Amino acid sequence: MRYLPCLLLWAFLQVWGQSEVQQKNYTFRCLQTSSFANISWSRTDSLILLGDLQTHRWSNDSATISFTKPWSQGKLSNQQWEKLQHMFQVYRVSFTRDIQELVKMMSPKEDYPIEIQLSTGCEMYPGNASESFFHVAFQGKYAVRFRGTSWQRVLGAPSWLDLPIKVLNADQGTSATVQTLLNDTWPQFARGLLEAGKSDLEKQEKPVAWLSSVPSSAHGHLQLVCHVSGFYPKPVWVMWMRGDQEQQGTHRGDFLPNADETWYLQATLDVEAGEEAGLACRVKHSSLGGQDIILYWDARQAPVGLIVFIVLIMLVVVGAVVYYIWRRRSAYQDIR
């Protein structure tokens, strides 16, 4: 059987020695999305992530895997990388053909269009410990996993998957290859990348935060928005506060990537108009060294009041000058 991604990666076992001991957890993920519109049209795109950083990209329209980092080759020589890439190329052609055969076998229970996602890799822990995973989603829903020595249908997945899973598990060669992939290949390849990309992975970028407001969908309410951008790594804590009290109505949106591989996040709070006084947005991030960012909503309003005050003072001064000039001219005319 050739259903599985990266089956020939067992050859990697000859490549690496021991890497430096890491100080934090990282996730290494190989992601694949395959779409089959019909028996004659399909598309497969893949990428590899180490932590939050993308290290490789493979478009359906490209015959070769693209590096997205200078260190994406890890500890592999050029020859070793070319050999690996060829294995991936053989795999992609085989995967497409095997899925088409699977659809024929399962028809009419399942038919086109079909969407399949694969996620495989490992969680890496300090001390060279790791835990690998291999998950498969069908039509956008988690359906199959590889655990121990066999493939398993997950709870809630359609029962018709039992047949292809039985076929897969009967192929002892494939099962052994997947075990090698998960137990040896992924952890060693990932640690080679970790060592090569250490400086990028350990960088710290401080967040920038600012406040704004938008009309709320609720009548008489205002939605306060705390924007946080430009931070790396991804974990961040953002909360609306009143004094020391966290505002449980705080809603945090999705993390959005910036072009420079930093992140953006916003936290909103819906309040009654006039109740925003005394609120503040608090931001915690590893790059801040414990010096949290605290933005007070009242302080945001201060510049507006200050501007109004300055304008009023200027009007008074201008008025006084005009009055002084007018009095001087009047006095001069009286003398004449």
Curated annotation (Swiss-Prot):
One of its GO terms (cellular component) is external side of plasma membrane. Expressed on cortical thymocytes, on certain T-cell leukemias, and in various other tissues. It is found in: Cell membrane; Endosome membrane; Lysosome membrane. Its main location: membrane. Disulfide bonds join C226-C281. Residues 207-297 form the Ig-like domain. PROSITE patterns: IG_LIKE (PS50835). Residues 22-305 are extracellular. It holds the Pfam family MHC_I_3. It is a single-pass type I membrane protein. Keywords: Cell membrane, Disulfide bond, Endosome, Glycoprotein, Immunity, Immunoglobulin domain, Innate immunity, Lysosome, Membrane, Signal, Transmembrane, Transmembrane helix. The chain crosses the membrane at residues 306-326. The keyword Disulfide bond applies. Residues 327-336 are cytoplasmic. InterPro entries: Ig-like_dom, Ig-like_dom_sf, Ig-like_fold, Ig_C1-set, MHC_class-I_related, MHC_I-like_Ag-recog, MHC_I-like_Ag-recog_sf, MHC_I/II-like_Ag-recog. Heterodimer with B2M (beta-2-microglobulin). Interacts with MHC II and CD74. This is Antigen-presenting glycoprotein CD1d2. It comes from Mus musculus (Mouse).
